[in-house]
Amino acid sequence: MPGPRRPAGSRLRLLLLLLLPPLLLLLRGSHAGNLTVAVVLPLANTSYPWSWARVGPAVELALAQVKARPDLLPGWTVRTVLGSSENALGVCSDTAAPLAAVDLKWEHNPAVFLGPGCVYAAAPVGRFTAHWRVPLLTAGAPALGFGVKDEYALTTRAGPSYAKLGDFVAALHRRLGWERQALMLYAYRPGDEEHCFFLVEGLFMRVRDRLNITVDHLEFAEDDLSHYTRLLRTMPRKGRVIYICSSPDAFRTLMLLALEAGLCGEDYVFFHLDIFGQSLQGGQGPAPRRPWERGDGQDVSARQAFQAAKIITYKDPDNPEYLEFLKQLKHLAYEQFNFTMEDGLVNTIPASFHDGLLLYIQAVTETLAHGGTVTDGENITQRMWNRSFQGVTGYLKIDSSGDRETDFSLWDMDPENGAFRVVLNYNGTSQELVAVSGRKLNWPLGYPPPDIPKCGFDNEDPACNQDHLSTLEVLALVGSLSLLGILIVSFFIYRKMQLEKELASELWRVRWEDVEPSSLERHLRSAGSRLTLSGRGSNYGSLLTTEGQFQVFAKTAYYKGNLVAVKRVNRKRIELTRKVLFELKHMRDVQNEHLTRFVGACTDPPNICILTEYCPRGSLQDILENESITLDWMFRYSLTNDIVKGMLFLHNGAICSHGNLKSSNCVVDGRFVLKITDYGLESFRDLDPEQGHTVYAKKLWTAPELLRMASPPVRGSQAGDVYSFGIILQEIALRSGVFHVEGLDLSPKEIIERVTRGEQPPFRPSLALQSHLEELGLLMQRCWAEDPQERPPFQQIRLTLRKFNRENSSNILDNLLSRMEQYANNLEELVEERTQAYLEEKRKAEALLYQILPHSVAEQLKRGETVQAEAFDSVTIYFSDIVGFTALSAESTPMQVVTLLNDLYTCFDAVIDNFDVYKVETIGDAYMVVSGLPVRNGRLHACEVARMALALLDAVRSFRIRHRPQEQLRLRIGIHTGPVCAGVVGLKMPRYCLFGDTVNTASRMESNGEALKIHLSSETKAVLEEFGGFELELRGDVEMKGKGKVRTYWLLGERGSSTRG
């Protein structure tokens, strides 16, 4: 690689020296409560990913979030000032950018600089800000040179960088076994700011340093075909794994020429470094991604050539927060910047500016909280580095040098339809390659080509240049080898035939049609539930039967009349390779009373499963955590010995090791014999690991050396099994759960992190054992020793257990008989306790149902009857709401609004209990009540609602708002009488709803009413006059939407009552 190109010239250093003295005299700054962000980005040219038209909306969204969150810079105002990094031609300039930065520093003394994004523009500005001790934050400037913190001490990159691309390629080389040679080509185009040069520079330096391999590089001009010819002559002598940075059209041209030259066969692979996915049409959508397609008559050849091509891009975030952010970003860009933003990977740049700015604001907030100032650039920058942050682009991690860990995607062509799709993703945070489920890299030979030809690039391997043997020598050699081969084959042929016959017979195969769900499984499936005794991953659970027996179940079924345990396998299909067939054969060969018997396996998609012996007593973990089961030490030693015997058989057999030994994989049969399950069949292990808390909880038994491996062996190791046994031994001894640490309440994740870290002394469970168990504690410590070589084998463990368990070596039968008597007594108490709990829960459920639905409707549902909709000839409906509620809500916090409505409707609910009415619903500030249904009350419904309305109005006059005690709550009420239809709507959260024009008219009476008055329709007035005693006042004709002019009345009060409207 040629020497690094300095992104800024010496004239800028002189400019810096001339401008610094007056800058040092500058006293103006970011005053308390006012933080200034200086933006140095292209303001006119929107072709840059970091142009202000793209980044500006993202900054606006970030500042809006800061303003909305009280925990970020409380009492401060954040403002932005703009400076252009473009010259007069609209191109990023290494002169315009630093001048703009100096002007902004002089005029505004900002607390932070945002941008530039272009490499040559960012270099001088980064040096200036380091000298000024002002942080610089950018999602551009991806070149390798910005990682030199001697020059760019306060530069933080929240976006992708080319050095991280090198990390991805290094991981890819390790995965594919390319550890000797690579070739990198980069295109040069006038005016392109040497984008490809800086990209290949980061790739070149990082891959060479990470892998210590030979990396060659070549530059070519995109518009000069003679350069393409020169490249094609050089490629066969320089590399087989080739990385190319160029435009999509140039890459296609180069691939077509390579096809003509015979370089697109199985010996070559070409990676197009198209980081923004321009050749893939960008964006999201169902359209096929065919970068080879142009419609120019060469598509057939181009598709053939692209079979040897892969494409590397940034990973497109697909989290919901990012998708919602894009919607807001596009809308804001169009509304405020008159810019139409298209879909594409380029949108990750403004999103990264958004996340970076929020991270900076968080760092400033923390600095202020610790007594610092916004001008303490070094402290603020250090708070941003080596830190994780959840942003709209997902999980954002800034490393210790201020660079974001970047995710990448590898695209490959589907040979069936020619479309490119993602087959591999790289997680920059964990530095792991994650294959996309159901997809794989396409290789002509079925495997990756070697990075160096078999005989070297120039046939320099001496093995390929030996002189040819004579014909006689060849014949003699062939004859000797043939004779030797015949003797060897004759010796093994019979044994091999027998083995092949056994493999071909497939005695292990189970047809899914022969597997019948057990009665227990059918009952659980029909009930829509699954019962388990422990929530920590056990495959077995326990329940209480009507016979008073403690039954234990897994996913069970009947196969050939026998009850078996069924373990579902999370795979789409199982390829029956010889490796898999041998695994199945080894499982059938296992015959040991302390290992669950392998019944067979079903490989018929989608019902892929493993059938094993069913042990009805559940797992060891279940038994240890069930406090109702008493375990004396004789019984515990018996269980421990069973584990040792089973593991001793595994370690001495063809399976060699377990790899997943834990208490939930130790099950107990009906005779209380412990058996180990879930061993062998590594090809049947689930592909997709569980996430979150569960994955850490399942690793609590895993040895530290296996935890530190990126891809530990599926079978684990024998020393790892001994470590797992030590953890189980502590579970059995203390019965306090897995990995119990006295005095500490740690999550599984915290435990795994401390074990993996390798503390001194090693972090292990507690050993708070009784005095007579000291020898058992010493055995545990030896089993979970940090050095695998120091752990004893199971043969030695067996001898050790025999030494200090001699006094408990009597027959276990007497102990089992007494224990079964204890179970019978305990189960009677459990049945009574759970019956009472059931009755209490039934009472609570009925009370809740009566609150949701009318009593008569609820009783129908309890009897299993269908609630039919019912028509009512005459009911009276009440509507009310709060005048000015919208304005009141805007001036109050959400909690104050919730408190207000809760106080008000609690008051209302207490009032309406005194009347023959039914509360239908409350929505926001609206309150709806009806009388006359579901139980008819003749014509009394109007009187009941009128009296209730007067009572509510009286209660409102004395009601006080907690956070505004001086204000009077203004209630507006409307009442109407007429026919309705009522019924229960929905299955989930069913509601008793009213339908009909009467409901709409009652709502119109409320909306056309006045505050603190009761508005009546003429229909309600007519019913009230039948009873007399109510004071009414004619309001007149009111224009109502959809009704025309309607004559209405005010309800003033009831004669003989103190309540008045």
UniProtKB/Swiss-Prot annotation:
Chloride binds at residues 85, 117-118. The chain crosses the membrane at residues 474-494. It is a single-pass type I membrane protein. CDD domains: CHD, PBP1_NPR_A, PK_GC-A_B. Receptor for the atrial natriuretic peptide NPPA/ANP and the brain natriuretic peptide NPPB/BNP which are potent vasoactive hormones playing a key role in cardiovascular homeostasis. Plays an essential role in the regulation of endothelial cell senescence and vascular aging. Upon activation by ANP or BNP, stimulates the production of cyclic guanosine monophosphate (cGMP) that promotes vascular tone and volume homeostasis by activation of protein kinase cGMP-dependent 1/PRKG1 and subsequently PRKAA1, thereby controlling blood pressure and maintaining cardiovascular homeostasis. Homodimer. This is Atrial natriuretic peptide receptor 1. It comes from Homo sapiens. The lineage of its organism: Eukaryota, Metazoa, Chordata, Craniata, Vertebrata.
